[in-house]
Amino acid sequence: LSADQISTVQASFDKVKGDPVGILYAVFKADPSIMAKFTQFAGKDLESIKGTAPFETHANRIVGFFSKIIGELPNIEADVNTFVASHKPRGVTHDQLNNFRAGFVSYMKAHTDFAGAEAAWGATLDTFFGMIFSKM
């Protein structure tokens, strides 16, 4: 990743990282099978849990970790290893990760000037998920 790509991604993410509930909602809406992987949410209606404290806590955890990754670009090997160590044992699939990506990108398109950052995000997400897929 180039310095310009990293700067673009970081600036773009800074605009949305304060809405972790919205980000997680978009991801779960895009692929309910992702939500089903979390025992506290499995079998529940997304609309009814969106405003709850457990949902907000989990959203903060996920977006906080993603914020850490974005902040540490391009040095994300340790974060990838942490992610793989916690997600591989739970049987998270490549399809679910691709759907997570699609839900996240959809959220970004709706809440930022994504067109100007799309190439940088594409390169960043390709790098991140490529590293994960090589280990899962």
UniProtKB/Swiss-Prot annotation:
Record's keyword annotation contains Metal-binding: yes
GO MF assignments: heme binding; metal ion binding; oxygen binding; oxygen carrier activity
Signal sequence extent: none
Coiled-coil region(s): none
Pfam families in alphabetical order: Globin (PF00042)
Summary of subunit composition and partner proteins: Monomer.
Family: Belongs to the globin family.
Protein's name in the database: Globin CTP-III
Organism name: Chironomus thummi piger
